[in-house]
Design a protein with these regions (language model features):
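N-terminal "domain-start" segment that seeds a small globular fold
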Residues: 1-11
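Thiol-based oxidoreductase modules, predominantly thioredoxin-like and allied folds used
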Residues: 3-4, 23, 35-38, 42, ...
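Short hydrophobic/charged patches on amphipathic alpha-helices used for structural packing
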Residues: 9-10, 61-64
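Short active-site neighborhood of thiol/selenol oxidoreductases, capturing the structured segment around
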Residues: 14-24
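Short cysteine clusters
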Residues: 28-31
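Chalcogenol-based redox active-site neighborhoods
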Residues: 66-67, 84
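Structural micro-motif
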Residues: 67-76
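Non-catalytic, surface beta->alpha helical segment in thiol-disulfide oxidoreductase systems
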Residues: 77-110
């Protein structure tokens, strides 16, 4: 899992894979609870197909405002610079489904423990 700093989302420019933004905060209990599960999910993904970026809303407040993040944890999925799907809450199965449902149909199923 990578991190976004200084409200910089230039990584969206040239990516040809799914990009998952995990909006979080250090003071958010549910965010801290799901963080290791998101890390494990991220580690199990093929980086050519999907990359996961953690975005601390306190460090990246302009970005959170621009993208209208209203709660944490929130997950935004981008493809070719466009927001294509999202979900909120500390539910790893929801996040897994968000990614799986948006991978190309030929993609093998992502398996999480």
């Amino acid at each position: 899992m990578l991190e976004i700093h200084d409200n910089d989302i230039s990584i969206l420019k040239d990516k040809k894979c799914l990009i998952l933004f995990y909006f979080t905060a250090t003071w958010c209990g549910p965010c801290q609870k799901i963080k290791p599960m998101i890390k494990k999910l991220s580690d199990g993904l093929d980086a050519d197909k999907c990359e996961v970026y953690m975005v601390d809303i306190d460090e990246n407040d302009e970005l959170a405002l621009e993208l209208k993040v209203k709660a944490v944890p929130t997950f935004y999925l981008f493809y070719e610079k466009k927001l294509i799907d999202s979900c909120s809450g500390a539910d790893i199965l929801k996040v897994h489904k968000l990614i799986k449902d948006n991978l190309p149909k030929l993609e093998k199923e992502i398996i999480i423990d």
